[in-house]
Amino acid sequence: MNKLESPSEIDVAGPSPRHKTTQVMVGNVAVGGGAPIVVQSMTNTDTADIEGTIAQVAALSRAGSEMVRMTVDRDEAAAAVPHIRDGLRKRGITTPLIGDFHYIGHKLLADHPSCAEALDKYRINPGNVGFKDKRDKQFTDIVETAIKYGKAVRIGANWGSLDQELLTHLMEENANSAAPLDARAVTREAMVQSALLSAKRAEEIGLPKTRMVLSAKVSAVQDLIAVYQTLASRSDYAIHLGLTEAGMGSKGIVASSAALGILLQQGIGDTIRISLTPEPGGDRTLEVQVAQELLQTMGFRTFVPLVAACPGCGRTTSTTFQELARSIQDFIRDEMPNWKTQYPGVEQLNVAVMGCIVNGPGESKHADIGISLPGTGEAPAAPVFVDGKKFKTLRGPAIAQDFKALVIDYIEQRYGDAAKARAEAVSAAE
């Protein structure tokens, strides 16, 4: 008889403890300091297009983005920001807004105080905040504006716009070293130093750690991992993760998930953005969905009910289970904005849609509610399991519609008014 082995490295499953960072409030959202990892997104509208930007921020917020960044690149964009904020509030949307500033941020914030006041956080790129003798003055101007209005700041170094003076200095220093590093290693060090030196300067000006978030974005996965590991080892600032220029479609999703997944597993990261290049006319909210799915798949947070579905094989020549899995998944995601308030806790629901008898019944039993559809050559019957027990068997051409109705009924019974009434009755009896 086989015996359970003594506890070993397999008895614990989970990420490393979270890297300890200083908590920062961005509007009404806590970042770092043990707070849940925050999902961030960015608009791609012309910020001067007030109605268009309001619509996209609203869509991103509805999809689950907890902070939204937008470009503030000229006077017209800066002037639009307070109107965007006001328009969102009229819709009941209080998602924190982040202004993305490059080159002339100091001037835009000074010339448009209503913009400075309306934003919840300013993003500064130390590589282009100013050049030569203007850098310190322009950086100081932005930081002092943040102090004046009580705003948070993200100091975001970027591989594509790195501080060239710092990089040149480190390259020359490396060339004269007895054991020089390769150029990419020096560039990674420049990324880390750019962020940390800028943060130190911001503190000297008067901005506390409680208002600072750091990032150091790279487009290559291994470089990004190394940069953030080093950044985390040298500081306790809140950290924003993102793979810059990740790309389109599956390439962008895979690259971002690979890089961020490793860092998150190591306990690094307080807020994330999945920077996907959208298809022409594509849905901007996809980046929010991918970020949520990454965090939920890794067990950090729950956003929407999970739908488990088998990949299909020669036993499942019918597309019925695929169509049902897609229908259930789309239905759940579309309804979640309403369900959040109507059915508290529904995001923890697990649904299984399986395609044949091999794994179907077992996986369905592990889910809260699951169905095992008939595979090729199997009897045209689909057993449904609820809370691990067989509930009923569906037959006929309307199996998909019938199962969807059962899912809706299960949600109502477990998370709706009936569930609340049962809980209140139990509480009263005690």
UniProtKB/Swiss-Prot annotation:
Sorted UniProt keywords: 4Fe-4S, Iron, Iron-sulfur, Isoprene biosynthesis, Metal-binding, Oxidoreductase
A Pfam cross-reference name: GcpE
Residues bound to [4Fe-4S] cluster: 310, 313, 356, 363
Cofactors demanded by this protein: [4Fe-4S] cluster
Keyword rRNA-binding found: no
An example Gene Ontology molecular-function term: 4 iron, 4 sulfur cluster binding
Highest taxon of the lineage: Bacteria
Keyword 4Fe-4S (UniProt): yes
EC number: 1.17.7.3
Catalytic reaction equation(s): (2E)-4-hydroxy-3-methylbut-2-enyl diphosphate + oxidized [flavodoxin] + H2O + 2 H(+) = 2-C-methyl-D-erythritol 2,4-cyclic diphosphate + reduced [flavodoxin]
Stretches assigned to coiled coil: none
Pathway assigned in UniProt: Isoprenoid biosynthesis; isopentenyl diphosphate biosynthesis via DXP pathway; isopentenyl diphosphate from 1-deoxy-D-xylulose 5-phosphate: step 5/6
Cofactor note: Binds 1 [4Fe-4S] cluster.
InterPro entries, per database record: Dihydropteroate_synth-like_sf, IspG_bac, IspG_bac-typ, NO2/SO3_Rdtase_4Fe4S_sf
Any GO BP: terpenoid biosynthetic process
Similarity comment: Belongs to the IspG family.
Job of this protein: Converts 2C-methyl-D-erythritol 2,4-cyclodiphosphate (ME-2,4cPP) into 1-hydroxy-2-methyl-2-(E)-butenyl 4-diphosphate.
PANTHER family in the cross-refs: 4-HYDROXY-3-METHYLBUT-2-EN-1-YL DIPHOSPHATE SYNTHASE (PTHR30454), 4-HYDROXY-3-METHYLBUT-2-EN-1-YL DIPHOSPHATE SYNTHASE (FERREDOXIN), CHLOROPLASTIC (PTHR30454:SF0)
Protein name per UniProt: 4-hydroxy-3-methylbut-2-en-1-yl diphosphate synthase (flavodoxin)
